[in-house]
C-alpha cells in the first residue's frame, strides 16, 4: 500500500491510498490487501486530522465507472471536510420498507 497527495486537492490534505498490486476494484483484492488498505487509510486520516484540523473526513472508495471509479486501479480517497466546502455526495433515498429490505438481505446470504 502507498499514499500520495491527490493532484486535484478537493480540500487541502486530500490523500490517495492505493494498493501496490495491480488490482482494479475492491472485489479483485484479497482480504489481507483490503485490510492493509483500510489500515493505511486510518493512519492517513489520523495524520490529516492532526495536520489540517478538518471538521470531518470522508473516506471514499469507488468501483467501476457506474460506481464513480475514474482510475482503473484500487484506491481510496481520504478527504478532509469542512462545512460549506462545496463537496457533495447525494443519492435519493427510496425507503423500500422492511419486507423489501428482508428480501434484499436474503440475496446476500451464502
Task: Give names to the regions the model predicted.
Residues 1-110:
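HIT superfamily nucleotide-processing domains
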